[in-house]
């Protein structure tokens, strides 16, 4: 993978290529690119990319790689970090979020944009040192712009449960690597070796062993469809038929992304 040091709008160091797209290198410290003045726009851009990937049922990294080049509409470094981080840890994130939902509710039955915002928020809570109130505030702000009236209180409760009951965040783990997370063994035995945000393949396969003994948040705010009326064979990725509202939202997200400086 080739690297160079050509300056770009958010340049903080060497870049790397993801397909034909030149983006900032993701370091061991996910916070390297979390500049306070740009991270809100970066989260919106990450939401756009992850939403599109979920909509068409493809790998978020493929959508990231297909985005315009650096001189037309650059992918913000922190947005790339978030997309790659969520893609690397999605199995574990979904496990934690599912355990924090009340009985009978699933991620698959949540509105698509809320599901993506929940993953983004859970990733920042569990894998970065972004202050928890800031994570929830950003998720609420984006939900108010792109989702339903019920989404803000729903996400507030869900992410609050992740903070209270979810696995300890990265900085609380007994590890020298600030971006690693030690997961308990599935059989209750000794802990598995730490896994890192950089190791996309191994993290995606190992992060399904988060603790399940977490409290549930009441999600009866009307933000998700009635579980009694939902198909049991629903698949989270690629099995959800996009609605006209989904396509309108995808267009709106992308339009805002391309016009945001």
From Swiss-Prot:
Gene Ontology terms: biological process: DNA-templated transcription termination; transcription antitermination
Q: At the top level of its lineage, which domain of life is listed?
A: Bacteria
Coiled coil (UniProt feature): none
MF terms from GO for this chain are: RNA binding
- InterPro entries xrefs: NusB-like_sf, NusB_fam, NusB_RsmB_TIM44
Pfam families noted in UniProt: NusB (PF01029)
Question: What function is annotated for this protein?
Answer: Involved in transcription antitermination. Required for transcription of ribosomal RNA (rRNA) genes. Binds specifically to the boxA antiterminator sequence of the ribosomal RNA (rrn) operons.
Instruction: Read off the NCBIfam families from this record.
Output: nusB (TIGR01951)
Disordered, as annotated region: 168-261
Which family does the record claim for this protein? Belongs to the NusB family.
Q: Which organism is it from?
A: Cutibacterium acnes (strain DSM 16379 / KPA171202) (Propionibacterium acnes)
- Gene for this chain: nusB
What the entry lists under Gene3D superfamilies is as follows: NusB-like
Question: Biased composition, Basic and acidic residues: where in the chain?
Answer: 242-261
Q: Which UniProt keywords apply?
A: RNA-binding, Transcription, Transcription antitermination, Transcription regulation
Give the protein name, as stated in the record: Transcription antitermination protein NusB
Which GO cellular component term is one of those annotated? cytosol
Annotated Polar residues bias = 217-228
